[in-house]
Amino acid sequence: MALPILFDCDPGHDDAIAIVLALASPELDVKAITSSAGNQTPDKTLRNVLRMLTLLNRTDISVAGGAVKPLMRDLIIADNVHGESGLDGPALPEPAFAPLDCTAVELMAKVLRESPEPVTIVSTGPQTNVALLLNSHPELHAKIARIVIMGGAMGLGNWTPAAEFNIYVDPEAAEIVFQSGIRVVMAGLDVTHKAQIHREDTERFRAIGNPVSTIVAELLDFFFEYHKDEKWGFIGAPLHDPCTIAWLLKPELFTTVERWVGVETQGKYTQGMTVVDYYFLSGNKPNATVMVDVDRQGFVDLLAERLQYYA
């Protein structure tokens, strides 16, 4: 039986590829997709969800837009990474359908309420929508199987020296998620920086030759440009967000540890940092499954295999 998931995202090149992977996988039943502000402004990330679902011929999936800003802060976007549209590079179709006339939280709550079994939430942007859901619907916590997020790291950052972008945008929301009592699975930079797609991998995807694999290759062509800066030390481009979906499909590709994680919301130098109690120094019980390594070739092979679904 397919695993029911709610997908909250802020497309974003890697979010878009995560959507492609999820919808090519019969093991997953995507009940709804909600958008968050983050990689671009909320109007653009919502539009990008609709554009991707139009491309994939999945206009049957319910879509709703989410919070327009973080819980307590002004919005920060990553237009320097993802371009003016949020999905610069390929020629994507215009949306062929409209989002529902409700909020992301209302749609998520409806899906949870109506599901006969607990639902996995996958969140690949700032945690604003998920935190709002948890705060406004405590009666639905038992209907959430786990929350799989892309965010954070153990001791490094990609937006500040200490903080990963998604957590930095809304650290208060991330702290609500980690301390909710619901199991969190964290795909942080420690693993996503190892999930790099190399140029030859992109050509492998392009050679599959269907319209979706071609779009994915073109998304990666654009994504490479930001990540070729030698400060990163990358061979290719890290595919952060698809790690969440890949873990659900093939957890054996990942090495994980069980640890307590908190989020720094006030630090002068460490605001937005995920504090991972790696050596069990805090006395707190683990609240997260933290990914620390990935079989890169297995990850690439999974993407290539699933891209053939769209032939």
Swiss-Prot record:
Signal sequence interval, chain numbering: none
Keyword Hydrolase carried by entry: yes
Active site: 240
One Pfam assignment: IU_nuc_hydro
Superkingdom of the organism of origin: Bacteria
SUPFAM superfamilies in the record: Nucleoside hydrolase (SSF53590)
GO molecular function: purine nucleosidase activity; uridine nucleosidase activity
Descriptive protein name: Pyrimidine-specific ribonucleoside hydrolase RihA
Organism encoding this protein: Salmonella newport (strain SL254)
Lineage, opening ranks: Bacteria, Pseudomonadati, Pseudomonadota, Gammaproteobacteria, Enterobacterales
Encoding gene per record: rihA
